[in-house]
Each structure stands twice: as C-alpha cells, then as structure tokens.
C-alpha cells in the first residue's frame, strides 16, 4: 500500500483527533455511526465457549506457530572493551494492541503467539463488534489475551493508543485501519502498513491446476489483490490462465502470467516485485535465492502457510518486503544498550577530542 488518498487521511485524522480528546464517548459514537452499534461492554474478557472444532483448529495453528517461534530469540551481545562492560539487552514492550479483522481468528493466532513469546505483559485484541465471537473469545483466553476491545477501525485503534496506553499496534486491516496505523505511528510502534494480498507463483513440472489453485485462494481476498504466475513452460501458463478465467469470480483480483527463461530471470523478477507471498512448485532452490519476499511456501499451497505451517501470515505488502519481513516476537521487543565502567576508561581522550571538534564544551569537560 503506497500512500493514502487525501480524503482518507483527512477522515482518519479527524477520527483520531476526536477520540484522543473525547475518549470512550467519542469512540462509541463512531462505532454506532460506522458499525451500527455502540458495544456494551466495550472491553470483553476472554472466556471459554464457541464451536469446539473451530477453537481446536485455531489452537492447532497456534501450537504449530509456537513450535517454531519459540526458537526465535534476539542475539546475545555482551562484550568487554576499553574498561567498559557493554551489552545489548532486548526487552518486551509492556502493552500491545493486536488488530484482528472481524471473524479472522487465524489472525489473532498469528499475532498473539509472537506477542506472548516476546513477553508482552498486557495483550489486547482490537476488533469490530461483529468480530467478538465466542470462538474468538475462547482462543483469546487460551493465548493469554487480557481483554478484547469491541471497537474496530480507526476509532478502536485510537482508543487503544490514547486511553489504554498500548506501546505497539500490529495487524492487518483495510485502508482506513492502515491509515490509522500510519497516523498513530507518531505515538506508538507499528509492525508496518499492510495492504492488499500479493502472490507470486513459480511453477515448473506440475499440472496447471496445482499452480492456479493457490492463485484463486489468494485472489479471493478481493479485487485489489493480485497474483503473478511465472514458469518457463508456455503450455502450463496457457492452460493455467484458461483455468483461472473459468474459475474466477467478479470479486477476485487479476492473475498475470509471465514466461521466464529460467530461475535467474524468475528470481530477479520476484525480487523486483517484493511480494507478500511466494509459492514455489517444482524448483525449491527458487525459495532460497529470493531476497525480497514476506514468506515462501514450497510444494504446498499458500493457504497452508496462511493457517498452519507455523509462520505468521502477517506479512509485508506493497513492496515493503524489500526492507521488512514476517512478523516475529522481535516486533514486540526493543534493544537497549548498556555500558558499565568496570575498569580504566581507555578511550576518554578520544571522546573528549570528538566533543571538542563538534563544539560541545560541557561534553568535553565531563570527560576530563
């Protein structure tokens, strides 16, 4: 998502300002206007209940994610140099707000597991009133969520930031939610700006039906989503495109096909697109050569990765995979530097000289 329409930003700025100054009353007024209901209570305590099969499936996804993500830890950095014990310590933020679009229980899993593993003390879910299902509340309880804020959109996020004291906001959502995250990033940390779903498929040596299946799955997210199918096999591309035209609905985004001369050309194209998802069939080395991508599924449909492969489906979009990646516990942590004098400070003169050169008199005097 590259930039926001001016009218969207102006509208969201007003909502954020109104909720900042007007608190819960303003947030509830916006909820009634935009979602048709002013929820009571606005904060819901997670509890057991709901369809046990759905809850069990969500917890199976959580278990898969935790098995991998529990192995992620910030690199330890401890060093003694010039009379100083130096360390980089990683600390979790105290409070996090996880934005979960209505009914997307899997997104709750993909955000709450990393936040919990990071050590966040208070994890809140922000979701529209219609998203507060018994299943969501049950999964939230199992994943250690403190409360569910039944206020969606910009007004819900603004309330969480200004009146619940969260330190980080994370999660996907529509245009107005992402505009709110952009504005609120002046006050709190965010995971990024997430836009429409993106998929690139590289297929070689598989039936065209296999290649098209993943594209149809991702493109059903809506007309603003898009997918590319790459292959050195022109016949595969032709049949796949025919299948897509036959199966697609009017609400789906476009599928573009491109014949490539080989892996080198494919990797170069993928890195230029920097897609959210990459689905690789037949040539696994493509997955390991690509630099700019959110997450890769190899010889499996991307929806398996979306739900249970153990990698969060909260991913960079809009080309931002060039500099950021899949969400992990590190999104809810921050590095703190500590320098402790434990011996003679051998670099004192170098520090004093730099202070003198830069014109900081009292810096220099403090170093004498």
Curated annotation (Swiss-Prot):
Catalytic activity, EC: 1.1.1.23
Record GO cellular component, one term: cytoplasm
Binding site for substrate: 197, 218, 221, 277, 306, 358, 363
Binding locations of Zn(2+): 218, 221, 306, 363
GO biological process: L-histidine biosynthetic process
Cofactor(s) listed in the protein's UniProt record: Zn(2+)
InterPro entries tied to this protein: Ald_DH/histidinol_DH, Histidinol_DH_CS, Hstdl_DH
Physiological role: Catalyzes the sequential NAD-dependent oxidations of L-histidinol to L-histidinaldehyde and then to L-histidine.
Name of the molecule in the record: Histidinol dehydrogenase
Organism: Pyrobaculum aerophilum (strain ATCC 51768 / DSM 7523 / JCM 9630 / CIP 104966 / NBRC 100827 / IM2)
Gene designation: hisD
């Amino acid at each position: 998502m590259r930039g926001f329409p001016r009218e969207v930003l102006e509208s969201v700025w007003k909502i954020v300002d109104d909720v900042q100054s007007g608190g819960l009353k303003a947030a509830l007024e916006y909820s009634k206007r935009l979602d048709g209901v002013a929820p009571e209570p606005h904060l819901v305590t997670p509890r057991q209940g709901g369809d046990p099969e759905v809850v069990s499936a969500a917890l199976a996804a959580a278990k898969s994610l935790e098995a991998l993500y529990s192995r992620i830890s910030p690199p330890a950095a401890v060093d003694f140099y010039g009379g100083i014990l130096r360390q980089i310590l990683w600390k979790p933020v105290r409070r996090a707000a996880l934005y979960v679009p209505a009914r997307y229980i899997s997104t709750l899993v993909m955000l709450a597991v990393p936040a919990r593993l990071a050590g966040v003390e208070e994890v809140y879910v922000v979701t529209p009133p219609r998203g507060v299902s018994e299943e969501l509340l049950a999964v939230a309880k199992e994943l250690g969520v403190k409360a569910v804020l039944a206020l969606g959109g910009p007004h819900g996020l603004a309330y969480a930031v200004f009146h619940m004291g969260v330190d980080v906001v994370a999660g996907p959502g529509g245009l107005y939610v992402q505009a709110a995250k952009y504005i609120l990033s002046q006050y709190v940390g965010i995971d990024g700006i997430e836009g429409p779903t993106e998929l690139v498929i590289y297929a070689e040596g598989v039936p065209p039906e296999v290649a098209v299946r993943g594209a149809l799955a991702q493109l059903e997210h809506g007309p603003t989503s898009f997918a590319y199918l790459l292959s050195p096999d022109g016949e595969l591309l032709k049949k796949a495109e025919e299948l897509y035209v036959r199966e697609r609905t009017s609400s789906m985004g476009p599928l573009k096909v491109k014949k490539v001369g080989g892996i080198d050309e494919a990797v170069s194209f993928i890195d230029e697109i920097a897609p959210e998802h990459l689905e690789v069939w037949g040539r696994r080395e493509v997955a390991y050569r690509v630099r700019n991508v959110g997450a890769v599924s190899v010889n499996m449909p991307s929806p398996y990765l979306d739900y249970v492969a153990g990698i969060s489906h909260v991913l960079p979009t809009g080309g931002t995979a060039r500099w950021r990646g899949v969400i992990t516990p590190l999104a809810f942590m921050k590095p703190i530097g500590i320098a402790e004098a434990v011996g003679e400070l051998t670099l004192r003169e170098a520090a004093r000289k730099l202070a003198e050169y830069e014109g900081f008199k009292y810096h220099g005097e403090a170093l004498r």
